[in-house]
């Protein structure tokens, strides 16, 4: 039975604005125990570490070379390895669109999931909040929304509302800045504090969406059934019940042909468990790949390690991402004719049948 191993790096829970960890990466592989041991023996035999961890190995140039060799091996036959990455500050923007702007648009009869309008909105806000103000202002706005969505208190609601209204009043004579803020302030009046209180729990936690995307990628390669083994130290255990719901083999079949290929249900996962990386060494390889992917995205282009990772093809392991671009048209986004609302409606039906709430 195929088994997929998963580990992550850069997870900070619902705090997507931690300056020291701007990137979140999940990595997965389906190497067998014998294949994994062969990889470790052939590449890392001279490392002398009881456990292979990217944070430790990447400190020494010689060990970085070993990691690059692992990436080169993975990209030579990429069907065994996949990564999913998220730019966490941009992810915060997408969640403001998802839980603050889209609900009001829906009430007004607009479908932001059609033709990737939600994606375009997030790109526009991310670029314009910095372009028309600065990076500091964008982070200040996102931090206020993050605090509001996490605390769900009237104090945090008023704090966020006052920030946006003060910014709006300061640019009344500036047509362009006023237009940007017009996407943010109406929900305070028209949705109100009750909307914030009624949101699902953990809406700023992006670990589950990444794992689902990886799961759908594997489902496209293997009909299943299959097993998932996640690192025991992962916080995914908190949302295992929701993962189990959408990955199980007993939900009704469905297929959604989207911009990144087909999403096929059921995923046919018959078991998900959390294991010690010392016992399941495939998890150690996931840690190395996730850490290297994060480094390749964080380090400047002139950095030697960055250059070697890209030369090894690490970018080719990324199957999907939450990442900002200046693209806003359906054609640029690759979402012309795509209606993401159909997937959400189906997921809501699945959750309703299982009598469990949908989370974003």
Task: Show the residue positions of the predicted features.
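Phosphate-ester processing/binding pockets and catalytic centers
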Residues: 1-360
């Amino acid at each position: 039975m195929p088994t997929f191993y998963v580990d992550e790096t850069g997870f900070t829970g619902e705090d997507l604005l931690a300056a020291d960890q701007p990137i979140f990466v999940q990595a997965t592989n389906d190497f067998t125990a014998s294949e994994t041991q062969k990889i470790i023996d052939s590449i890392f035999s001279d490392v002398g570490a009881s456990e292979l961890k990217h944070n430790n190995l990447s400190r020494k140039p010689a060990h970085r070379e070993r990691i690059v060799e692992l990436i080169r091996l993975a990209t030579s036959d990429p069907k065994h390895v996949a990564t999913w990455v998220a730019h966490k500050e941009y992810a915060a923007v997408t969640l403001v669109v998802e839980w603050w702007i889209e609900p009001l648009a829906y009430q007004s009869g607009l479908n932001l999931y059609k033709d990737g309008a939600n994606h375009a909105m997030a790109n526009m806000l991310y670029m314009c909040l910095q372009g028309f103000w600065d990076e500091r202002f964008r982070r200040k706005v996102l931090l206020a929304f993050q605090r509001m969505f996490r605390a769900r208190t009237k104090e945090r609601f008023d704090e966020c509302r006052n920030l946006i209204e003060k910014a709006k009043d300061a640019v009344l004579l500036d047509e362009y800045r006023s237009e940007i803020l017009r996407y943010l302030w109406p929900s305070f009046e028209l949705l109100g504090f009750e909307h914030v209180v009624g949101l699902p729990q953990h809406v700023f936690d992006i670990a589950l969406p990444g794992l689902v995307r990886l799961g759908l990628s594997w489902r496209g390669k293997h009909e299943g059934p299959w097993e998932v083994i996640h690192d025991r130290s992962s916080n995914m255990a908190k949302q295992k019940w929701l993962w189990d719901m959408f990955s199980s083999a007993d939900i009704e079949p469905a297929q959604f042909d989207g911009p990144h290929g087909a999403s096929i249900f059921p995923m046919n996962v018959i078991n998900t468990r959390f294991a010690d990386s010392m016992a399941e060494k495939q998890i150690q390889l996931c840690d190395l790949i996730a850490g290297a992917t994060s480094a390749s995205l964080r380090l400047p282009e002139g950095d030697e390690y960055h250059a070697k990772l890209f030369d090894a093809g690490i970018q080719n392991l990324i199957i999907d991402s939450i990442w900002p671009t200046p693209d806003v048209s359906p054609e640029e986004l690759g979402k012309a004719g795509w209606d993401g609302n159909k997937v959400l409606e189906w997921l809501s039906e699945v959750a309703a049948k299982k009598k469990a709430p949908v989370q974003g």
